[in-house]
Amino acid sequence: MMRFTIIVIAFLLIIQSLEEEHILVYAHEGGEAGHKSLDYQGDQDSSTLHPKELFDAPRKVRFGRTTRAEKEQVTAMNNDSWSFKISGEHKQTNILADHDTTKNTFCKKMMIIVNDLTSLPTLEPSTSTNDMEKLARLLRDDYPIYSKPRRKPPVNNRAPDKF
């Protein structure tokens, strides 16, 4: 479970760093200043074809992408289980996460402070040799489909030529 949370944390950190560098492109009307989005920004190539400044009307964005981006924004705002604050000056990452500290369903919020991402434990595959043998047996062609082998039918139900 800890490895899974580390993978999720790393993935979310990568996404956040891409957002800060304005690499990710969002499909929503009226983004932040200097932020790339699919609404019309009045670039030089198409300014003569669709002059936004003259009509002052936003470009119509495709319906599916807009709603998907808005849903992702709403779920990101409503998601209380993860919150990140990255401070570039201190090179410190504060991660707030729900962490199950007891056997029952009681969860408390705890803060994990990671000074350097290299200090996280290395991710190793969690498969043992026994699991690998089971997987190899499942992937073999001669592995039976059913868990129990079929038994021979009783003598009175066999075909006449099988006696």
From Swiss-Prot:
Disrupted gene: phenotype observed: Dose-dependent altered root gravitropism associated with an altered PIN2 traffic that impairs the formation of auxin gradients, thus leading to an irregular waves root shape.
Any one Gene Ontology cellular component term annotated for this protein: extracellular space
Keyword tRNA-binding attributed: no
Region (Disordered): 144-163
UniProt superkingdom: Eukaryota
Modified-residue entries (Hydroxyproline), positions: 154
Tissues in which the UniProt entry reports expression: Expressed in roots, specifically in the root apical meristem (RAM).
MF (Gene Ontology): growth factor activity; hormone activity
Keywords: Differentiation, Growth factor, Hydroxylation, Secreted, Signal, Sulfation
Propeptide: 21-141, 158-163
Signal sequence range: 1-20
Gene Ontology process terms (BP): cell differentiation; positive gravitropism; positive regulation of cell population proliferation; regulation of root development
Additional note from the record: 'Golven' means irregular waves in Dutch.
Family to which the UniProt record says this protein belongs: Belongs to the RGF family.
Protein name: Protein GOLVEN 3
Organism: Arabidopsis thaliana (Mouse-ear cress)
Gene: GLV3
